[in-house]
Amino acid sequence: MISLIQLLKEAVAEPKAIILAGAPGAGKGYILRGLDLAGLKILNVDDIYVPMLQKANVTLDLKNATPEERSEQAKQMAAANKQFKGDVEATIEGKESFILDGTGASYNQTAKLKNELEEAGYKVMMLYVYTDLERSLTQNQDRYEKSEGKDRSLAPAIVMRTWKDVTDNLPKYADLFGNNFIAVANTLDNRMEDIEKIIKKYLTPFKPTGTKPKTPAQQKRSDERKAKDKEEIQTMLSDDFIYDVIEYTMSKEEAQMRIEKFLNS
């Protein structure tokens, strides 16, 4: 079988970009390796951000970070995003084929990038990796320890919010990318289905301390947003919703064939 790397080399006249989407802990790296795509150029802001945190002597265990560490993390993320943007622009200017490894939490930013890539002469595909909320939170919670401190764990509240946004975007991405949309599922066999129990188990133990007090108006808006998020997430945890999501997905073998066809087109 012709390798995907060979296909890319033969199609240098028309660069290809694969935008990777999925919540933290969805197993995007695992899926990439299973699809024989690991040899392609991969752009991931974490490859810049994590070394910056290490150089600044800031913990990668972001779920347990102090207020001072959270402040430094935000500073380093801003710097990493600036450098990452330059790397993406240079790759596009060089007409290199690549994989953009992100979450896809922002539909508007992703749609804008797709348009910019197409205007630059790229053919663009999305590879979307769906996972359930509990797996996303579990993988994130264990990542720092399992990597022996070499990989970062995010604040679980951020993971849950990102999961909600990227899951909500699935049908919109399917419509945006059309035939160039591929989705695979990577889920737990048994999962919790009650949002309050999930919050109690995965979020409450890591609730940030030392945060700046909110004004009554700010607290009201925050409470309303959290209530709305919980209601939406509870719907997303239902069997009916998950069955609808799975309808968009395909086997890894079919995904492999679709990607090969895309790269060879």
Q: Which positions does each model-derived feature cover?
A:
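Proteolytic processing junctions in secreted/extracellular precursors
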Residues: 2-11, 239
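Phosphate-binding P-loop
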Residues: 11-15, 90-93
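Short hydrophobic/aromatic beta-strand immediately N-terminal to the Walker A/P-loop
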Residues: 17-19
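Conserved glycine(s) of the Walker
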Residues: 27
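Conserved GTP-binding G-domain of TRAFAC-class P-loop NTPases and closely related GTPase folds
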Residues: 134-265
